[in-house]
């Protein structure tokens, strides 16, 4: 269980990818025999949202997240289908990770609610409209969890080990 409360250049994904690679290399496990639950919560929540949401709601500006290519506030999710140089390890991108057997990406609904409400006025919509758009804008294959903290706790209750990845 990889707890990602900060963007941290996408290292939450890279920690999970490193763990899975180590499990297959060191223990000769096959893909899917080890699992990783990555939780994007708090200010890392936008890593679980589409480029359209990033652009419309100016998430880079709102949360001081710089685009690795332009060095300006990001208007895109640089861990989803990244360009060369966007991440230290583009093999650990969210689109590749969520497609791997045994990998689940959870996106904190509590943070989605709070952050969408904060961003609504700047996008010219009501908080209710923003929330619906953000809920619909979760990256394909990821899932909304009631809250990131709840997901972290419940995962541990069910035997997952904890890794701070933010």
Regions found by a protein language model. Give the residues of each.
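Secreted/extracellular ectodomain signature
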Residues: 1-166
